[in-house]
Amino acid sequence: MEIKQHGSSDYPFQYYYDNLELFDFHCIEWHWHREFEFLYVESGQVTCGIGEKQIILSEGEAIFINSKILHRFYASSSGIIPNFVCMPEFIAPENSLIYKKYILPIISSNIYFQRFQTDELWQTKIIQTMIKIMEIQGNEKIRELATLALMQDLWLTFYENVKLSDKGDVQTVDEVAQKRVQLIMQYIHENYNRNLSLDEIASHIGISKSTALNLFHRFLHTTPVNYLIGYRLQAASWLLKNTNKKVKTIAYESGFHNVDYFCRLFKKRYHL
């Protein structure tokens, strides 16, 4: 799970105005967090990887991603995606009736995303409320109070219209499979800078190598080893941009013990 804190403990809401063109490979890589997320496509076309699904969002569409769900965003060119993440208890205290009756049933359900398009009246209302939330972020005088009021309005519309048993645009997830993928990813994130084998990665969560391969193919469309290499290269890229360390040092700190091999992979990945 992401370690990064979104918002603060006394105001667990955070707004981002992201342009995918500014990210490496026009991509916000696979991640998950306890906050649920609402994302709007202001311009461009964005591919959302959510669990095992690939959803293409066009300009003017939006999406809800539930708490702790694995997701990724990609655009072939520019993709402007204003978005906000929010702790469930921002809308109402965790021990309150409001939370237990209207929030918990959704965040603890097997719904993992809901797409919003303008051909449904209630979905149009959700999108309009999202835009209001984004616009109010520039108003320092009433930002926090207005954001809370609008979030409660948004959630009311969402709760009134989403049906937990729907099999249409509301999508469900294989929770056990996703949890295994997340555990493997977390293990890689914590141990990428040392020698790791597929056997060790799989045995860490008590599954076979073939099961680990199948899970990563289903969810991430890659292998655990290729994901490990990609994560190491991502870590190396950050060190190259933000430190004055020598290439050899960066290679070793990123888990590569052959500098020539590291340089070949890095140049290939970043088209140098």
Question: Can you annotate each of these PLM segments?
Answer:
Residues 122-125, 173-184, 220, 229-232:
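N-terminal positioning helix adjacent to the helix-turn-helix/winged-helix DNA-binding module
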Residues 253, 260-272:
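…primarily DNA-binding HTH/wHTH and HhH modules…
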Residues 1-19, 70-135, 160-165:
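A hydrophobic/aromatic-rich effector-binding and dimerization subdomain
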Residues 1-62, 68-69, 75, 99-100, ...:
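Generic protein-terminus/edge-of-domain signal
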Residues 60, 211-216, 261-262, 266:
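Short hydrophobic/aromatic patch on the recognition helix
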Residues 106, 155-162, 188, 216, ...:
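Hydrophobic recognition helices of helix-based DNA-binding modules
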Residues 121, 137-153:
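All-alpha amphipathic helical-bundle segments outside canonical DNA-binding/catalytic cores
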Residues 186, 190, 195-202, 207, ...:
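Terminal helix-turn-helix DNA-binding modules in bacterial transcription factors
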